[in-house]
Amino acid sequence: MQLTPIASNMTEIETSEARILFSYRTPVAAYIFGEGYVKTDQFWSVTTSRHINKWGARDGQEVPQARLDNLV
């Protein structure tokens, strides 16, 4: 597992399955290898939405928050 700080309160973790974007301490989007970008279907805040868009997952498929939680 590799941890990469991207910006203030924005971190990426890479596992064997995916690259996962954390906004603050919450996984909010992921690039799942072989599937593509996904993002949470839960609204957290304007800042978290900005993090998702900046990371490139704006057009990703919305998935339940539990799916992102289970990637870590």
Regions found by a protein language model. Name each.
Residues 1-72:
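Terminal leader/tail segments of proteins
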